[in-house]
């Protein structure tokens, strides 16, 4: 995973890089993994969802081709707010994204190619979310 993502959607960014590199993602129902929660618990839901939204902005900027980048930036915010029950700070997520954009050592923007976009659609996915 990229070190830019402490928590939230880091697997999506990794999947974009894998697919864009020409690899396929295979579902194998016999392989099971368990995500363990830290004994101290998670941070408050609002903080977690805000970080997730900021990470989505970063991932979209890094990997989404146009026009999907713009569509994603506009459409994903209400999508996340709906599913998170309004438990996210859009303003704070935008500030986190803006801070990340100003970092001198941040990764360069490398949108996924057309073959990766076709693969995502062929698997039943959508590029905008």
What residue ranges belong to the model's regions?
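Short, well-ordered coil loops that connect the C-terminus of an alpha-helix to the N-terminus
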Residues: 1, 65-66
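A structural signal for well-ordered alpha-helical segments within the folded catalytic domains
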Residues: 12-13, 50-54, 58, 88
